[in-house]
Amino acid sequence: MIQPQTLLKVADNSGAKEIMCIRVLGGSKRKFGNISDVIVASVKSATPGGVVKKGEVVKAVIVRSAKGLRRADGSYIKFDENAAVIIKDDKQPRGTRIFGPVARELRDKEFNKILSLAPEVL
């Protein structure tokens, strides 16, 4: 469950290391986001020479959540950390590599490029 002020690890090589959620997109009363939801975030720490800089406001999609997610078959998927991938406006990732596993639920919202770059899809 991701809400404003939540810190997330960045799971790509766009240059950002950590981002903080500013807003969960998808309605004015939306308070929480889960896996495959798009958020607006601020870059809190970044590597030198990266594509994104510290303080930049970016869009990101949540790929891992410590809260977990219930699937249609009744099973749950849960990760050790909260992580996101920084995206462009056309749902394409800004980085060229994805680190760590991502959830299969990204396919429902058509983040196919992220799924193809990920080393493991759970």
UniProtKB/Swiss-Prot annotation:
Q: Name one GO biological process term.
A: translation
A cellular component term from Gene Ontology for this protein is: cytosolic large ribosomal subunit
Identify the domain of life: Bacteria
A GO molecular-function annotation = structural constituent of ribosome
Q: Disulfide pairs? A: none
Similarity field: Belongs to the universal ribosomal protein uL14 family.
Biological function:
Binds to 23S rRNA. Forms part of two intersubunit bridges in the 70S ribosome.
Q: Which NCBIfam families match?
A: rplN_bact
Self-association state and partner proteins as the record states: Part of the 50S ribosomal subunit. Forms a cluster with proteins L3 and L19. In the 70S ribosome, L14 and L19 interact and together make contacts with the 16S rRNA in bridges B5 and B8.
Protein name as catalogued: Large ribosomal subunit protein uL14
